[in-house]
Amino acid sequence: MNKPPEKFVHVTEDRLLEFASGCFKKAGTERSHATCISRLLVNSDLRGVRSHGTVTVNGYCRAFEKGDANPKPNIKVLSETATQAVLDGDGTLGYLPMSKASEIAIEKAKEYGVGIATVRHIGHYGSAGHYARICMEAGLIGFSVQGTRNHGNRRDAEEKPKLGYYGNPPICFALPSANGPPIVLDAATCIMADYQRGPEFDVLQEKIPAAFFKSMGYTAVATMLGGGLAGVALSGGEKVANDWPGAVQGGMVLAIRIEGLISEVDFRNEVDRLVSDVRASYEPMPGTDVASLPGAIEEQRMILHREDGIRYGEKEQEQTREVSARLNV
């Protein structure tokens, strides 16, 4: 879980949006593309998900500048049915094509009950929560997941890596509420964070193997739904990866209309009931004051950050200064 920075300055939402958008335009993207990425990154900052916020602007701009990602993609719908669509991201970062895929899935779900869209040939996906939340904010249940081309192939490694750490793709379920915080499981599939490596963590594979088998299974399923189902392994991916070396990922977004299965009002009220009962019935997790389900903390931080400004940590400031100086933004 992302922790609030110990040292920070307050920055307004609008200022970050303007800055990030200016950087992306300088790096070669169209205005609408820059606006899309910036909006999603600032949303992450508002929710306190610092790892996937505007701290990434510097690296993303470098990807556009170096030719690792396509700043001016021609995003196409390759095939489509009443409830399904397949998009080609043309080597760009995942944000714009996955946002388009989410809107398509929403439109289909509202008409037919379920909508699913996959995207192939994209670079970094960002938080899966972006796309599941787009569905949720449209009054639907949202699910999103990412996969990577040739994931799991480490045949060239000098020493075989630990199986318990073999992947950590992003995955998200987003369930709308009535009045309280929604339930949003915005996570990655491995039980360990990417930085949690070493003997003290390796021993856990012996002490709690069931937890690692679960996360290994989640990783395998995520890789196939977000990668295999999206077509990242098809032959056309080789050319895209040669043209845009960072574009080795794919993604999937699923939107489910609640009405037709159950009254939307009843479902939203049941989400509220679950959140309320858990809060009243259970001891909080260590380091927290309230027994909250996933999604509640992000909701609280968004309210706080919109009132007081986003708490912008030292790492974010360092990356912002660097990209500002390089692009003169």
Task: Walk through the language-model features, giving the residues of each.
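Catalytic-core signal marking the mid-to-C-terminal active-site face
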Residues: 2-3, 7-11, 16, 26, ...
